[in-house]
UniProtKB/Swiss-Prot annotation:
The gene is cobD. This is Cobalamin biosynthesis protein CobD. One of its GO terms (biological process) is cobalamin biosynthetic process. It comes from Clostridium perfringens (strain 13 / Type A). Converts cobyric acid to cobinamide by the addition of aminopropanol on the F carboxylic group. The chain crosses the membrane at residues 48-68, 77-97, 150-170, 200-220, 295-315. It is a multi-pass membrane protein.
């Protein structure tokens, strides 16, 4: 249990360390190497190539993490707990998510919209060159809302079930989707299993995140009446079966509209809207979303501890 608290507190204090030695970056390097290898092995069947790449990436990551934790526990149980806590910390990005969004808003408030667009491009996939202030703020809110699941709640959820090794396994799944889960010509076959299996792994965390956003909205005295209506109506308004769940909850809590049309690689992509435009999206909505994020991450840690307690009693 203490290892989950260590991971949560370290993220709360330090945040996401932006350096080339971050363990998650090594998963990315492993993924690149596995892609090259399995594309050569199965040149004529890229779906199979992608599946084997996914399998090796995920289980190598899990095995290495399990080995590190096992060795640390063998040396000293306290060391094992500390190492596990640090590894869990590397899987959580609550503070990093908040900080990156606020960087965009700080620049925007200074009046440099060109620089704000550039900063936004580091955290979103859409084209940002022509976005106005409202579109920039909307993009930040959407990014924070969507990533509450895969950046915070999902790692904590899997850490609660299986400690650092399972949290890292999840991050490997998520990394595969981030790198391969595109519908373009290069990855539509190779990334097929990465995208589908990411949906499977995020099924429970995405819905759990939405429920925690609802609870957080009650605690923070936001629009609790509207949140149920919007969540029930719009939770599937996305090409992903999971992404709209936290976004719909946030949109309902703030009384704003998210989603809609965006440009990706120069092409206009029409997406369903999420929420009702009861008011214009403002910079203050980013701060409110960050308040929700803080409460959700705390509640997520509590849920992970409860899961761990239940499993320890059962097992």
């Amino acid at each position: 249990m203490i290892k989950i608290i260590i991971g949560y507190v370290l993220d709360l204090i330090i945040g996401d360390p932006n350096n080339p030695y971050h363990p998650i970056r090594y998963i990315g390097k492993l993924a690149s190497n596995m892609e090259k290898l399995w594309r050569k092995v199965f040149k004529k069947n890229l779906k199979i190539a992608g599946f084997f790449a996914w399998l090796f990436i995920v289980f190598i990551t899990f095995g290495v993490t399990l080995g590190i934790v096992h060795i640390a526990n063998k040396i000293n149980p306290i060391l094992g707990t500390v190492v596990s806590g640090i590894l869990i910390y590397f899987c959580i990005s609550a503070k990093g998510l908040k900080v990156e969004g606020l960087k965009v808003i700080k620049i925007l408030k200074e009046g440099d919209i060109v620089k704000a667009r550039k900063q936004l491009s580091y955290i979103v996939g859409r084209d940002t060159e022509n976005l106005d202030e409202e579109a920039i703020v909307r993009a930040v809110v959407e990014t924070v809302a969507e990533n509450m699941s895969d950046g915070i709640i999902a790692p904590l959820f899997f850490a609660g079930i299986g400690g650092a090794p399972l949290a890292f396994l999840y991050k490997a799944v998520n990394t595969c989707d981030s790198m391969f889960g595109y519908k373009n010509e290069k990855y539509k076959d190779f990334g097929f299993f990465s995208a589908k299996l990411d949906d499977v792994f995020n099924y429970i965390p995405a819905r759990l995140t939405a429920y925690l956003i609802v609870i957080s909205s009650f605690i923070l005295r936001l629009n609790c009446k509207n949140i149920f209506k919007i969540y029930k109506r719009d939770r599937y308004n996305h090409s992903s079966p999971n992404s709209a769940h936290p976004e719909a909850a946030v949109a309902g809590a703030l009384g704003i509209r998210l989603g809609g049309a965006n440009y990706y690689f120069g092409k206009l992509v029409e997406k369903p809207t999420i929420g009702d435009a009861k008011k214009k999206i403002e910079i203050s909505d980013v701060y409110k979303t960050n308040n929700i994020l803080g409460m959700v991450s705390f509640l997520g840690m509590v849920v992970a501890l409860i899961i761990r307690c239940i499993l320890e009693v059962i097992i």
